[in-house]
């Protein structure tokens, strides 16, 4: 059934309001014990401060927060009284709201149609962002080590590129291990999912599990792993048994690198990774351009100086190539498209960029733990509201106009309307729908993605049919 733009936004409004109306928040605050008797500062007021009216709840003074609260709700609080309300129950309250929101149906109907969707149920992108916090919280949130961070918070996110749906989420200490979280994410795998993983999450065991569960993967290969091919002429013992050490031949990656031109791709279709339990997989080698090599060397030098990490001589020699492993069928993702598909992972970097540049999740003063945690979960709720709205608008803009929405532009414009969204939610879903229709009109006019440099966009790589003004023609990804 094809719904109108208004009908789709009405359904979206109803789902959003279900989690954020004042009456729902009041009941939730009582249920979780944040409010035990009638007070002038309720769950709704707490949500107002941390979700809606202030970007800088961890850095503005308490006097300023009291002023902003009074301007928005008429509630009069002293700085000391307000600070007392930032307690463990307040953290639990905001954490619960965020958890129910990202597990809700807000993004379930936001998936875009694409060639990739016919082959892969979901395209799962996983990454983490980390930021420093006050040093006195180092025992609770130890940082990532080295000379980079004493205390830090790491946020892990896995989401579906088709719909924007959050699949797995974790807020924890900066030192938390990426690989451990990557393994935990396997619990939500479905057959037909495509998982795109970077080196921080690399695990042969995880890749093998994905394959066994009917899911697909594209991952960078860590250079401390050896690539083998089957030996066509192995040695045998007299009794006819194959000599184990002669079953496989090690691939000389450096030799392959030296024979590839910049931008060229080479594939080993039947390769084996690992010394003992060997993973059977495709191995794709992409020769970086000179510009990409210079950027990588610069990044390596920065990592060595700032984090105290020393790259092996082998890693430095193989700087000129990216090595990917994948179990995707060659007919669906040929070797020439592996690098492009892997680059879809960088979409999550755009999301993390908005968290810091637009939502200022990493801004803080020397404050207590509970206030910082309220700030983090409040910002995450605001982020999810804006990002889920963006993904809904992305689908509607494609559906109506066959245009590609700029994620970064759109989230900024939606954030500019947060105060209007807040006011509408205090009233009813009809008013919220009207604001969302206004937003759609704005994004339709000013939110389209620029194609000035003729670079492949996410729509091109995923095979989304859309139109753009570059040459006044329709553009479809291969």
Curated annotation (Swiss-Prot):
Q: Which InterPro entries match?
A: RNaseH-like_sf, Transpos_IS4, Transposase_11
| Signal sequence, renumbered to the chain | none
Q: Which superkingdom, per the lineage?
A: Bacteria
Keyword vocabulary terms for this entry:
DNA recombination, DNA-binding, Transposable element, Transposition
Specify whether DNA-binding is a keyword of the entry: yes
Which SUPFAM superfamilies would you find in this protein's record? Ribonuclease H-like (SSF53098)
A single GO molecular function term of this UniProt record:
DNA binding
- Pfam families from the xrefs? DDE_Tnp_1 (PF01609)
GO:BP terms for this protein?
Answer: DNA transposition
Family under the similarity heading: Belongs to the transposase 11 family.
- Function comment: Involved in the transposition of the insertion sequence.
What PANTHER family does its record include?
TRANSPOSASE INSL FOR INSERTION SEQUENCE ELEMENT IS186A-RELATED
Q: What is this protein called?
A: Transposase for insertion sequence element IS231B
């Amino acid at each position: 059934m094809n719904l109108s733009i208004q009908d789709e936004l009405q359904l979206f409004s109803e789902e959003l309001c279900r989690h954020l109306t004042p009456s729902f928040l009041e009941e939730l605050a009582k249920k979780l014990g944040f409010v035990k008797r009638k007070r002038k500062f309720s769950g709704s007021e707490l949500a107002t401060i941390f979700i809606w009216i202030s970007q800088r709840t961890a850095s503005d003074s308490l006097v300023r927060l009291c002023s902003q609260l009074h301007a928005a709700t008429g509630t009069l609080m002293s700085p000391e009284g307000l600070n007392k309300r930032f307690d463990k129950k307040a953290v639990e309250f905001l954490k619960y709201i965020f958890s129910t929101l990202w597990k809700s149906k807000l993004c379930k109907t936001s998936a875009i149609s694409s060639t990739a969707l016919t082959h892969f149920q979901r395209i799962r992108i996983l990454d983490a962002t980390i930021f420093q916090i006050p040093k006195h919280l180092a025992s609770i949130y130890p940082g990532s080590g080295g000379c980079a961070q004493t205390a830090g918070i790491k946020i892990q996110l896995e989401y579906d590129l088709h719909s924007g749906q959050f699949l797995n989420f974790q807020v924890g200490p900066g030192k938390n291990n990426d690989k451990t979280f990557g393994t935990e994410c396997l619990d939500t795998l479905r057959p037909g999912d495509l998982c795109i993983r970077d080196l921080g999450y690399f695990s042969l065991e995880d890749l093998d599990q994905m394959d066994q569960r009917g899911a697909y993967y594209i991952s960078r290969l860590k250079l401390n792993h050896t690539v083998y091919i089957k030996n066509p002429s192995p040695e045998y013992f007299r009794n006819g048994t194959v000599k184990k050490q002669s079953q496989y031949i090690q691939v000389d990656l450096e030799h392959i690198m030296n024979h590839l031109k910049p931008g060229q791709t080479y594939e080993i279709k039947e390769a084996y990774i690992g010394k003992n339990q060997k993973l059977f997989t495709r191995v794709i080698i992409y020769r970086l351009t000179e510009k990409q090599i210079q950027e990588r060397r610069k990044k390596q030098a920065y990592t060595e100086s700032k984090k105290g990490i020393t790259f092996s001589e082998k890693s430095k020699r193989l700087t000129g190539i990216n090595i990917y492993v994948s179990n995707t069928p060659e007919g669906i993702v040929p070797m020439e498209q592996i690098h492009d598909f892997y680059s879809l992972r960088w979409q999550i970097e755009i999301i993390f960029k908005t968290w810091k540049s637009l939502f200022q999740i990493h801004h803080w003063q020397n404050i207590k733990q509970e206030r910082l945690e309220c700030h983090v979960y409040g910002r995450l709720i605001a982020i999810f509201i804006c990002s889920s709205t963006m993904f809904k608008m992305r689908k509607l803009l494609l559906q109506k106009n066959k245009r590609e929405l700029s994620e970064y532009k759109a989230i900024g414009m939606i954030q500019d309307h947060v105060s209007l969204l807040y006011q509408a939610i205090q009233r009813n879903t009809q008013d919220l729908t009207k604001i969302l229709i206004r937003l759609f009109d704005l994004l339709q006019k000013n939110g389209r993605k620029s194609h000035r440099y003729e670079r492949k966009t996410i729509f091109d790589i995923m095979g989304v049919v859309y139109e753009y003004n570059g040459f006044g023609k329709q553009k479809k990804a291969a």
